[in-house]
Amino acid sequence: LIGILFFSFYVGTFNYDLNVNPGLVSKLTALAANPALAWVLPTALFLMFIGGAGKSAMFPLHIWLPDAMEGPTPVSALIHAATMVVAGVFQVASLLPIYVQFGAQEQLHWIAWIAAFTAFYAAAVACTQRDIKRGLAFSTISQIAYMLVALGVCFYDSRNGSFNSAEYLHHGGLGYMAAMFHLFTHAMFKALLFLC
């Protein structure tokens, strides 16, 4: 919430869609070009990611999801598939053009590292669970983290160790498509797993 309020205070709108709100591009460009306020956009975007990380159960905010599996199975299906855990992934995906075009690519780097650690940690913990629902919860955490890894690394140029927004249409599009495809397939099959 602090990141959203911080962002809207400096930009003047809650509408983050660059296609619908053409005035947002000029405001973000001016904000990124101002040396005194260059910290505002990366800070606001990272704070928004922290909020999404809590919803998507990223490490260290992952504790709530395995404990939520005590509920009825249809509730577990909704939490895993459609409503709660995919909110953070969708948030990062919808803000991806702002991350890339306006100099907040370093935050994508942090998102990728946090998500990669979460993916391996949750997968290892899932293998040690004796309760099937807790194992599925950690499996979901791992899969959500893989989606965020795809979004976080899709603009990283390994040739020179920096981000390159010129490759947005090809490489960035592939990472975005991989994350969104995995989001939909995971939602479909995890819901079927719980409900069938």
Name every feature range the model reports, one short phrase each:
Residues 1-196:
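...captures the hydrophobic TM-helix bundle architecture rather than a specific catalytic motif
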